[in-house]
Amino acid sequence: MPEARQILVTSALPYANGSIHLGHMLEYIQTDIWVRFQKQRGNQCVYVCADDAHGSAIMLRAEKEGITPEQLIAYVQAEHSADFADFLVDFDNYHSTHAEENRALSEAIYLRLRDAGHIATRSVTQYFDPEKGMFLADRFIKGTCPKCGAEDQYGDNCEKCGATYEPTELKDPRSAISGATPVLKDSKHFFFKLPDFEAMLKEWTRSGTLQEAVANKIAEWLDGGLQEWDISRDAPYFGFEIPDEPGKYFYVWLDAPIGYMASFKNLCARRPELDFDAFWCKDSKAELYHFIGKDIVNFHTLFWPAMLEGAGFRKPTAVNVHGYLTVNGQKMSKSRGTFIKARTYLDHLNPEYLRYYYASKLSRGVDDLDLNLEDFVQKVNSDLVGKVVNIASRCAGFIHKGNAGLMVDANPEPELWEAFQVAAPAIAEAYEGRDFGRAMREIMALADRANAWIADKAPWALNKQEGKQTEVQEICAFGINLFRQLVIFLKPVLPNLATAAEAFLNVAPLTWQDHTLRLANHPLNPFTPLMTRIEPAKIDAMIEASKEDLAAQNSEAAAPQGNGELVKEPLAPEIDFNAFAAVDLRIALIEKAEFVEGADKLLRLTLDIGDAKRNVFSGIKSAYPEPSELEGRLTLYVANLAPRKMKFGLSEGMVLAAGPGGSEIFLLSPDAGAKPGQRVH
């Protein structure tokens, strides 16, 4: 048996200023599954995390609520911890960045960087709120857009026209905190000399530490030249003061990743077998993995490894990046009830339903994952209840009634047993590579074979025949052993189901190696239902509970009000029904969206319309600067528009969007349940 690996695993630190939602849970469930698999295999795997508990946003929210920042982060940490525990995310330690371990490590790393010449200082001119006595980040400044004249826009970009600009370009600026007119003021800032580590980062990011798509994105930043990173903020600020610099604080993103180290150090104080230096020293042989979302890639793949290198610590073995979560093909929405908090989900549904669904769709890539609620119900009910649990419920009763609960020693189908054994390494390989979707497909294929074999043998029919009792017991004992195999393979995903199954099977906690064994002449405990079906009414109740209170907006909307859109673009001349009916509108799935070289406004869309593929060039680039966000989304497509030859290729139709143009282009999407190829009537 190979020597046990030493592994330290982290997930990104949730910000201590709000509740956990299902988008967050994607990452923690993904990480927890991988960690549970490692532990089930016998490896020493430690999983740590913490609340990210510093920054102006926390300071200002606490002030607004009339409490201290310390009280706020304590309340939020308790809420986060309860949500994670109830979703069966089993951290070895869940800490806070506002802790003495983190203060000491942040100061030590900063001082090492400073003493090695990797810290620079210079004066920075910023807006200052004279009433609050604080410098203002861009998001705390509002005013009139210098490009289009739209009012109430943020200090760095306009949500109306999409323009970006410097805060000093904003017209009529005001503090979003106090409403005061800000003044320009100089302040000394501290910068981490990231360019000092450019050569190291170019090598490290191409050494197998990142997925290829992530490494390619990082290469774009590296090729564009690295800039020094501002790591300081001025008082008042909730965080750690910079050593020897009164009134200057570490920017939250400096001490946040150090929180991984601090949480582990806090755990080491309670677990003597863990040696902090053995995991974090420069020549450590232990493995270190960070699981993160694609929105924080630059911090974890540029700033963080450079800080570690400069301070004399080891760098991560790998940074595993996942995509965003959509619900029913769209961004989560409070008005649609699809912005679902973890606690709201838990109030209505079993956490293992979501753990399995996420696992079934997760791959090792960075693609976004869609939580399609209709598919969610179907997959859980079919796979977990209809396939896995069904095996035990089919067989257990015959063993209890016919043999007092004692499983006989039986292997009536050696070929099927061998198929389960042969599949184990492939399933393990998929878990190891974070290709959980492939692992679930392999497991469900085995469940299908087990159910088909039991259905073919039909013990319920044999049980009615004279002299067939021995055969019935052999079939059902073998069926229970196949069920046990599936439980072993699913245990990282479904720990509660595994615990309940272990109680029914009357066995110790199952390890991965147990898949090689069969229970023989073994007593079972009484069988009770291990999992129930999802009722669609529970999904509906969860959605309703997630919806914002829109009563005020609805009452406002009830009064007839014009918005000027018909003035901007008057109604077209009337047409008859036949003219409209000649247009063939179809539902299309956007399989791929990409930039078109040499085109300022176009995106190339590859559409799935059910039984065919279509290529469309669409002038929506200004509204969708990240084309990949469109992939997996349903839209409306004019299917019988004559193909148009363009210099970039052939455009086979048109997708539908609303809006005047520029950043105000809104691609149309059908309601949930629509399928590619369906005609719009």
From Swiss-Prot:
Catalytic activity reads: tRNA(Met) + L-methionine + ATP = L-methionyl-tRNA(Met) + AMP + diphosphate
Q: A GO CC term?
A: cytosol
Residues the record lists as binding ATP: 334
Looking up Pfam families in the UniProt record yields: Anticodon_3 (PF19303), tRNA-synt_1g (PF09334), tRNA_bind (PF01588)
Using the record's annotation, list all stretches that form the tRNA-binding domain.
579-681
Q: Which organism is it from?
A: Azotobacter vinelandii (strain DJ / ATCC BAA-1303)
Q: How is the cofactor bound?
A: Binds 1 zinc ion per subunit.
What is this protein identified as? Answer: Methionine--tRNA ligase
- The main enzyme category here is ligase
Give the lineage.
Bacteria, Pseudomonadati, Pseudomonadota, Gammaproteobacteria, Pseudomonadales
Protein family: Belongs to the class-I aminoacyl-tRNA synthetase family. MetG type 1 subfamily.
